[in-house]
């Protein structure tokens, strides 16, 4: 996915990826 990497989105993605 190519989206604007906002702090919230980035942190959310990282949290989801790491579990």
UniProtKB/Swiss-Prot annotation:
This is Hormone-induced protein 70 kDa. It comes from the Eukaryota. Induction: Most prominent protein induced by estrogen in hypothalamus and most prominent protein induced by LH-RH in pituitary.
């Amino acid at each position: 996915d190519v989206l604007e990497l906002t702090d919230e989105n980035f942190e959310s993605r990282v949290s989801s990826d790491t579990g």
